[in-house]
Amino acid sequence: MLKQTPLFDLHRDMGGKLVDFGGWNMPVNYGSQIEEHHAVRNGAGMFDVSHMTVVDIQGTGARDFLRYLLANDVDRLKLPGKALYTGMLNESGGVIDDLIVYLMVNGYRLVVNCATREKDLAWINSQAEAYDVTVIERPELAMIAVQGPLARGKVHDLIGAAVLEELKIFQGVPLSGEGYADWFVARTGYTGEDGYEIILPAEAAVQLWQDLARIGVTPCGLGARDTLRLEAGMNLYGHEMDDDTSPLVANMAWTVAWEPAERNFIGREALTAEKSAGISHKLVGLVYTGKGVLRAEQEVTAPGVDGVGVITSGTFSPTLGYSIALARVPVGFTDQAVVNVRNRQLEVKIISPCFVRSGNKVF
């Protein structure tokens, strides 16, 4: 039996094509994935991301616990509402999950992936046993992402909270006032566009979705969410990183806080050894302007370089009009490579793993 978000009936009524996504019955599109993609790049689109797992960490040991649990350092969060992107690693340095952690007034809030929920909660709870903390999953909360160059203005029109005007990127704030209990609005996203991710009580989500649709925000499915994040060069768990892939290989080295040197975090010893030895593979972007679409699991080779790489995510880019991909390749690969597709060899350009930000080509 697939799980349903509080917006399930609305998705069905609005023509959403529902599919199994990590055990959840979610809309992949509402008719045209490409139109939904363009709506986010050029205007404002909204996504139901209530399948994400929200976990609050409270107690006197919360800070020390998260400084041990996460590769990034929550001590970087100086003000309530500030957010940090991080990997949660195993002892071998592999990525159990990637997540966002917020500093809250009464502790911390984690937002983790839905497909890894059971694994994540088991790991968090097992590691928490040594600390004075309480781990609280918040299944009663829903989450709606509103993304695009017009997204913030649309949300401001509805909510009218002056505090949102001052919100900086990667910062969130709890709303106050009648009707806004347990609302938390963060200037974060997974599209390469500006916007908000709104965490709110499940019973309030339907009205917010309907109100956003009424003022012209386009409902978008998971298909557009994937092409948008891929254009932005953002990792997807299970593709660009997993339990056997370290953040150093997955273009996430910037999320590892090495200082202060005395901070011990899970996976630090393994990452230190890997860093000293030098990584064997790296994550790159691929661009193919010919006919055809690059797809995950296709092999990548480079003339004169030993070893074989693999595409981790690939798609047709609606913004650029040709195919792009992320690939894990040997470090010796430079600016040109070949993707082997059946009996064809497609010549591709290698770039840094980011293609589009704020609607503009960045390579």
From Swiss-Prot:
- Name one cellular component (GO) term: cytosol
If you read the UniProt record, what top EC class would you report for this enzyme, in one word? transferase
- Has keyword Transferase? yes
InterPro entries, per the entry: GCS_T, GCS_T_bac, GCST_C, GCV_T_N, GcvT/YgfZ/DmdA, GcvT/YgfZ_C, TrmE/GcvT_dom1
Enzyme Commission no: 2.1.2.10
Pfam hit, one: GCV_T
One GO biological-process annotation of the entry reads:
glycine decarboxylation via glycine cleavage system
Q: Which domain of life is it from?
A: Bacteria
One Gene Ontology term of the molecular function aspect: transaminase activity
* Catalytic activities: N(6)-[(R)-S(8)-aminomethyldihydrolipoyl]-L-lysyl-[protein] + (6S)-5,6,7,8-tetrahydrofolate = N(6)-[(R)-dihydrolipoyl]-L-lysyl-[protein] + (6R)-5,10-methylene-5,6,7,8-tetrahydrofolate + NH4(+)
Write the record's keywords in alphabetical order, separated by commas: Aminotransferase, Transferase
Q: Which family does it belong to?
A: Belongs to the GcvT family.
Subunit structure, interactors included: The glycine cleavage system is composed of four proteins: P, T, L and H.
**Role summary:** The glycine cleavage system catalyzes the degradation of glycine.
Name this polypeptide is given? Aminomethyltransferase
Recorded source organism is Teredinibacter turnerae (strain ATCC 39867 / T7901)
